[in-house]
């Protein structure tokens, strides 16, 4: 279906607006994946706070101009599915990584985070980022361990001082 100029402008405006508010982006090639599987992916994306869209490469190049995802321009070759993580930087990467494991024909092309291009081979860097809750839990456990260790050392020093006296 041919798009008229107004439709193209609307697509560019929508994708550009989403890109400005996104934390990260992942680009993939979904050739050979069934419609049912893509529907499952889109549903999982909505639940994870990921905006997904298949967009023409020329329109996508225009949409990412002036955003942190401009570094992805070289990845816009062939059929392009772009996903923006809106709530957590690793959400789209994690979603695509899991989907690619189950679907051999689904290929992740590249990702971008804070203006840095992440090649498909290093997508784990983005996919393994802890969520906000996980990061807080790790920080709290580290602080708790440090406090407990300090208490143990203090008690040992008091015990040694009493033994010496």
Curated annotation (Swiss-Prot):
InterPro entries: Ribosomal_uL10, Ribosomal_uL10-like_sf, Ribosomal_uL10_bac, Ribosomal_uL10_bac_type, Ribosomal_uL10_CS_bac
Signal peptide bounds: none
UniProt keyword rRNA-binding present: yes
Source organism: Cronobacter sakazakii (strain ATCC BAA-894) (Enterobacter sakazakii)
One Pfam family hit: Ribosomal_L10
Disulfide bonds: none
GO CC annotation terms, alphabetical: large ribosomal subunit
GO molecular function, one term: large ribosomal subunit rRNA binding
UniProt-listed CDD domains: Ribosomal_L10
General function of this protein: Forms part of the ribosomal stalk, playing a central role in the interaction of the ribosome with GTP-bound translation factors.
Entries under NCBIfam families matching the protein: PRK00099.1-1 (NF000955)
Protein's UniProt name: Large ribosomal subunit protein uL10
Assembly information from the UniProt record: Part of the ribosomal stalk of the 50S ribosomal subunit. The N-terminus interacts with L11 and the large rRNA to form the base of the stalk. The C-terminus forms an elongated spine to which L12 dimers bind in a sequential fashion forming a multimeric L10(L12)X complex.
GO BP term (any one): translation
């Amino acid at each position: 279906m041919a798009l008229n100029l107004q439709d193209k402008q609307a697509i560019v405006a929508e994708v550009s607006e989403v890109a400005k508010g996104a934390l990260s982006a992942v680009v993939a090639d979904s050739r050979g994946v069934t419609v049912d599987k893509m529907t499952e992916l889109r549903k999982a994306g909505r639940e994870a706070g990921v905006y997904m869209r298949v967009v023409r490469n020329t329109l996508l190049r225009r949409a990412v101009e002036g955003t942190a995802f401009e570094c992805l321009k070289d990845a816009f070759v062939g059929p392009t599915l772009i996903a923006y993580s809106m709530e957590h930087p690793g959400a789209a990467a994690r979603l695509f990584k899991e989907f690619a494991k189950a679907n051999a024909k689904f290929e992740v092309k590249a990702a971008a985070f804070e203006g840095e291009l992440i090649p498909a081979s290093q997508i784990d860097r983005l996919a393994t980022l802890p969520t906000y809750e996980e990061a807080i839990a790790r920080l709290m456990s580290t602080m708790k361990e440090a406090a407990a260790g300090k208490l143990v050392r203090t008690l040992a020093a008091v015990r040694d001082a009493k033994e010496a006296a």
